[in-house]
Each structure stands twice: as C-alpha cells, then as structure tokens.
From Swiss-Prot:
GO MF annotation: an example: ATP binding
Top EC class for this record: transferase
Binding, sn-glycerol 3-phosphate: 13, 83-84, 136, 246
Modes of activity regulation: Inhibited by fructose 1,6-bisphosphate (FBP).
Amino-acid positions noted as binding ATP in the UniProt annotation, renumbered to this chain: 13-15, 268, 311, 315, 412
Name recorded for this polypeptide: Glycerol kinase
Reactions accelerated catalytically: glycerol + ATP = sn-glycerol 3-phosphate + ADP + H(+)
Keyword match Glycosyltransferase: no
Length: 502
C-alpha cells in the first residue's frame, strides 16, 4: 500500500492532537482531546503524564479511523510538543514517579534564587546553554522531583529512573520502551544541554545533582528515531522521523530557513523565534539563545523571546471571570469600543518572561475608572498579547541590528482579526498568516518527511506553504508610541509583586 500521508503528533499544554497531512500539505484529519490541568498550590502547574499518553494515543487512533487512513499508509510520524515540561519515570515499570511538572510552574523559584547567588555560574549557564536561570526550564524541575519525591533520589542514583521532556515520554511509549531519546531543540530547553559542545553539560548536572544516566540520547530533529511498537497503531511499525519542540517546529513549518527570518506563535504562551544561522547569537536584551533544529549533526540556532501567558489570558477572562462565553466572542466585544480608554491588563499570572524575567511579577489591571466596562477589560486582554510580542521583537531588533521585515504568524489566536490588526499596528510591520494554521504540526511532518524521502528538499517545502492574509499597519507611529509607553508603565506596576506581598 502506498505511503501517502504523514502523521503529526502535536502534544500541547492544554490538549493532545493528531493531524494527518498529505504530500501537498493538506490536512486529511485532525483529532484533539483536552486533558486535566492540575494546580496543587499557587504558581504550581502539573499534568498527569499517563493522561497525556492516553489522550495522545487516543487521538492518533481517532485521526486514522475518522480520516479513513490505514496505519500502513503513514510514511512517518513527526512529533512536536510543549517544551520544558518534564517527566521522571521508572525505567522498569514505565510509571511516572510524580506528575509532569509543566513549563509554567514556578515551584523551583527558590532553587533558581540559590543559583543566582553565584554570578559566575549564572554566566556559565547563559554562555553554555543559551538560557537564563529561571523556573521555566526543565533542569530545576528534575532536581525538585529528586529532592522531594520519596525514594526518587536513591532510585536515580541507582540508575533506575529516566527523565525526559514530553517528546521523550511519547517516543518511549510509542516504542514500548525501546527508545529513550530527544532531539537537539528539546534538549536545548532543559538548561542541562551545552549548545556549543552539543552534549549534556556535566558541570550543570553535578551542580543540580542530576545523574547523567537519567538523560535521553540526543538526535537530529530530522532523523529516524525508531519505529512504533506493533501493538501501538494497528500492527504497523511506523518510523518516528521528525521531532522538535513546538516553537522550533513552527519556525521550520513557516520555512524560515534563512538567517533573519522570524515567526511568532500565539498559543497558551506567545513565542517569537528568529533564525540566526549556524552560530549562536547571545542576547543583551533578555532573549534566549536556542537550537532551532539540527540536521546531519549540524544545528541551526535561533533567538527566542518567551511570553508565558498569551492565549491563556483569553481562557482566563472566559473561565475565570466569565466575561465571554467563548474565546471567539472576545473579538466581538473588543471591536465594540474604539480603545481601552487607558486600561491595561498585564497577564503576569506566573511571572514575566522576555525581556523582564521576573518570577515574582503577578497579573495587574490598571487604569480602571467608573466608566470601565467589560469590553475594556476584554480588549485590554487581547492588546496585552500584542504588547508582549512587541516587547520581544524590539529586543530582537537590538540584538541583531535588523529591522523587522514582516512577521509570519500562527497559532489559535491568529484567527482573531482584531488581534492581528492590532499586532500589525503596534509593530508598524506587515503580518503574514499562512493558509495552513496548523503550522506547528506542519513543521513536524516537514522534518519527518525529509528524513524518509517523502519530500525531496526544502525548496519543495517552500512551494507547499501559501499565504492566506496579510495585515498592514493602519495606526500612525505617534499613537502607537503613546500606547506602548502606557503598557510599559503598567508592566512596572506588576513587577516583584509576589516577592513584596507574599
């Protein structure tokens, strides 16, 4: 039977998804299932790793069944995943020793504070991992599990525990424990991987007291990792041939193959990446240096700005405040008024990312008067997403010396035309939205397809990607500058709140 499709395994922060693509990049079928968000304490976020695997394997089977595609028609699987979220499990039983600790979780802030007391080590971490010391990354989360779960430290020292980001956890389960591996992009998000030597960093592992025996093998983003176990997907042994963290996969899906090309993904968080070529560029502006992907042992590097809360602020005004019935309603209410009337919402629910890196910042609404209505709050929430993206992209301009020559966008929130137009206005730049909104999944299948010869080369990939809509700035630069100054003042009000008032 001909291999006409590639299956994207897209494991996100709030849902597990499976997407079947054909050779022209068309979507045959999407299946999706949300899973439980666990909040044991203020600032703590967890997932049940077994529920992640259960929902992910379920939607894979559902996509095949309802897409009327047989497993042996799948040429390869590409995996893309929420990054930094980490699982520690028993090597023999495959059972997690604790819930997955999610990238948003701030429980290891005190561990990070301890590291920051050693400026030389902080410098070492930045120069060798490309990251700042923050609870966002996997390394301190693993240390917390080993230090706080009964018996975990002893088992780890005895070589009985494994760890991995979500891609590694899925590969382990898809292959029934035959493959314990990750790719360069996911490894570069752990704060444990040396992006210069391309090895796990022994100095950092020793500092955090994490045994190297727990760590997965690191492979190219476009490479056959192994095949699915015959019991996993209807008896077929399908090559797992592409793996990348969600933001890296999106950069690849946008065909940002040349130095200086950039994209912004609007999901739970908001993430901008710029391709900086085959050598790392280190930021003076609070950006992260990361590995975008690797092919044939050669990494492509990127600068990244990370915003922790983007689309999640719309979930909050829907579920937490009850201001809208659906996320789509936010656009309707935002366009009922001409402006926020001076209201700003800073969604620092779990701290602030680039360029502030303030673990203790908390959510703030400023500028409220007796005239403030729910429309103003809703519009301010949407505008906050765009302002945070501008914070990041301004940093990229400073670090690279390049003006933003348009921005490629993707993610659920790009369906909100108000947000995209406001983003174009506030950046004073063109915004391009592709026809395929599932760009993260597309990036994963592009990587997998190249590895198995499904597509010939990157030039062929470029011919598949087409633009649906372009947004041009409609607001003058003086008005933009005035509004942006207000945002910066609002951010100042949110900083260090938990530190001062906890």
């Amino acid at each position: 039977m001909s291999k006409d499709f590639i299956l994207a395994v897209d494991q996100g922060t709030t849902s597990s998804r499976a997407i079947i693509f054909d050779k022209k990049g068309n979507i045959r079928k999407i299946a999706q299932k949300e899973f439980t968000q666990i909040y044991p304490k203020s600032g703590w976020v967890e997932h049940d790793a077994m529920e992640i695997w259960g929902t992910q394997s379920g939607v894979m089977r559902e996509a095949l069944e309802f897409g009327r595609v047989k497993p042996d028609q799948i040429a390869a699987i590409g995996i893309t995943n929420q990054r930094e979220t980490v699982v520690v499990w028993d090597k023999e039983t495959g059972d997690p020793v604790y819930n997955a600790i999610v990238w948003q979780c701030r429980r290891t802030s005190s561990i990070c504070d301890e590291i920051k007391r050693d400026p030389q080590f902080v410098k070492y971490i930045k120069e060798n991992t490309g990251l700042v010391v923050d609870a966002y990354f996997s390394g301190t989360k693993v240390k917390w599990i080993l230090d706080n779960v009964e018996g975990a430290r002893e088992k780890a020292n005895a070589g009985k525990l494994l760890m991995g980001t979500i891609d590694t956890w899925l590969i382990w389960n898809l292959t029934r424990g035959k493959v314990h591996a990750t790719d360069y992009s996911n490894a570069s998000r752990t704060m444990l991987f040396n992006i210069n030597s391309l090895e796990w960093d022994k100095k950092i592992l020793d500092y955090l007291n994490i045994p190297e025996s727990m760590l997965p093998e690191v492979k190219n983003s476009s490479e056959v990792f192994g095949v699915t176990d015959s019991h996993t997907l209807g008896g077929a042994e399908i090559p797992i041939a592409g793996v990348a963290g969600d933001q890296h996969a999106a950069l690849f899906g946008h065909c940002c193959f040349e130095k200086g090309m950039a994209k912004n993904t609007y999901g739970t968080g908001c993430f901008a990446l710029m391709n900086v070529g085959d050598k790392p560029v280190y930021s003076d502006e609070g950006l992260l240096t990361t590995i975008a992907w690797a092919e044939n042992g050669k990494p492509t590097y990127a600068l990244e700005g990370s915003v922790f809360i983007a689309g999640a602020v719309i979930q909050w005004i829907r579920d937490g405040l009850g201001l809208v019935r659906s996320a789509e309603d936010s656009e309707y209410y935002a366009t009922k008024i001409d402006s926020t009337n001076g209201v700003y919402l800073v969604p620092a629910f779990v701290g602030l990312g680039t360029p502030y890196w303030d673990m203790y910042a908390r959510g703030t609404i400023v500028g409220i008067t007796r005239d403030t209505k729910r429309e103003h709050i809703i519009r301010a929430a949407l505008e906050a997403i765009a302002y945070q993206a501008k914070d990041v992209l301004e940093c990229m301009k400073e670090d690279t010396g390049l003006d933003l020559a348009g921005l490629r966008v993707d993610g659920g929130a790009v369906q909100n035309n108000f947000l995209m137009q406001f983003q174009s206005d506030i950046l004073q730049s063109e915004i391009s939205k592709p026809k395929v909104n599932e760009i993260t999944g597309l990036g994963a299948v592009f990587l997998a397809g190249l590895a198995v010869g499904f597509w010939k080369d990157k030039q062929e990939l470029k011919s598949i990607l087409t633009t649906e809509k372009v947004f041009e700035p409609q607001k003058d630069s003086q008005a933009v500058a005035h509004d942006y100054r207000g945002w910066k003042k609002a951010v100042e009000r949110s900083k260090a709140w938990a530190e001062c008032y906890s």
